[in-house]
Every structure is written in C-alpha cells, then in structure tokens.
Amino acid sequence: MSNYKEIAWQGLWKNNPGLVQLLGLCPLLAVTATLTNALGLGLATVAVLIGSNVLVSLVREFVPKEIRIPVFVMIIAALVTVVQLVINAYAYGLYLSLGIFLPLIVTNCVIIGRAEAFASRNSVGAAAFDGLMMGTGFTAVLAVLGAVREILGQGTLFDGADQLLGDWAASLRIELWHVDNSFLLAMLPPGAFIAMGLLIAGKNVIDKRLEAKKPTPEAAPAITRARITKVG
C-alpha cells in the first residue's frame, strides 16, 4: 500500500509531468485556451497513459531490449488512434477544437517516458496506477491553466462544455463578467507561458514551506573524551 501511496504522491505532486518534469509543453500551452479543451485533451492523455502502461507491462518480458522503444511507440500510436476515433465519433466538436494536438499525443514524452521508466519494470497493477496518477496530475495542470486563461481572456468558465459532455452541458457555461474584447495576452501562447511560470513558482513556494515545516533531526550529543594525565 505504501508503494501505491508513493506512486500517487509522485504523479500528482512531487514528480508532476507538467510542473516538475515539464513534459508535453506543446499541447499543454497550445490547447489550454479554455477549460473544456484542457479537460478533453487531459482525459484523452489519461486513457492513453493507462492503456500504454498496461500493455507495455504485459509484453515487457517478450520484447527484446534493442527494439523496445519502437514497440512502445507502436503500442502508443495504436491507442491514440483508438482514442482519436472515439472522440471523432462521440465528441466531434471537441475533435475539431483539439485538431492536430490529438494525434500528437503519440509524441508526448510523458507517455513514452512512463512506458520506458516505469511500466517496463513493474507489474500490470502498479503500471496502470502509475498511468492513472501521472495522467491525473497532468490533467490537473491542464485544467488549472485552461481555467485561468479562459477566465482572464473571456470572462467565462466551461465555455463549449457541450462539445465534451453533450448538449445538456451547455448549461454549465458560467459568464463571470461580460467582456466586449478578449484579453488576447491570456489567450495567446505568451500568456500561457506566463501562467505556466506562475504555476511552477507557486508549487516551488508550497514545497519550500512544506520543507520548512518538517522537524529537523536533532544533532547527536558531542562525545567528551577524558584525557588521563596521571596514573596511580
């Protein structure tokens, strides 16, 4: 159980793919203009991460080390194709919004990195849980970044939620304030870089405060040595 707790802690916070490893920055910065797009890409990434970790863990004993990377990439590409077809069939609006970044999940270093560093060395259960935690941590960063950019840029939240969840989700849209013109800096890549930097800085501040609260180990008492100068 403690091993699974460590996997969760690593994926959600300590070794978060977005805030610590800084992997997958291209889609992370390009697709997070709205919370809906961020959640859509995040959920797709979670599905591929779990599936690829499970399959890699299952075939790890049968794949020669010399060709393991091409095999892992083929597994990931097959799963991304399945996810892409599912989104195309059931969430076509989201499929159009994500565009090229959906098939580019194949090249996401988070996925191939976990397949190589963890799934190929651990059991199926641990690999699946690692994929879930790493994917959830990555999705959380996407969601926070998407929410911040959407609020600052458009004054809304969950705009276009019907593209992800269906027609009923159109009622989830929240207009926090009315803006005649969008705040372009928040919607464009420079704003995404600034927001990402602030998120990383915030995490570092929290980590330092948590580290400062840890009790410092007490120093061992010094050993005093008595010097004998006279015998008898």
From Swiss-Prot:
Keyword match Transport: yes
GO biological process assignments: electron transport chain
Transmembrane intervals? 18-38, 39-59, 69-89, 93-113, 128-148, 182-202
Q: Where in the cell is it found?
A: Cell inner membrane
Q: Does the keyword ATP-binding apply?
A: no
Under InterPro entries, the record lists: NqrDE/RnfAE (IPR003667), RnfE (IPR010968)
**Membrane topology recorded in Swiss-Prot or TrEMBL:** Multi-pass membrane protein
State the UniProt keywords alphabetically.
Cell inner membrane, Cell membrane, Electron transport, Membrane, Translocase, Transmembrane, Transmembrane helix, Transport
Pfam families, alphabetized: Rnf-Nqr
Quaternary structure, from the entry: The complex is composed of six subunits: RnfA, RnfB, RnfC, RnfD, RnfE and RnfG.
Protein's job: Part of a membrane-bound complex that couples electron transfer with translocation of ions across the membrane.
Supply the name of the protein.
Ion-translocating oxidoreductase complex subunit E
Native source species? Shewanella amazonensis (strain ATCC BAA-1098 / SB2B)
Q: Upper taxonomic classification of the species? A: Bacteria, Pseudomonadati, Pseudomonadota, Gammaproteobacteria, Alteromonadales
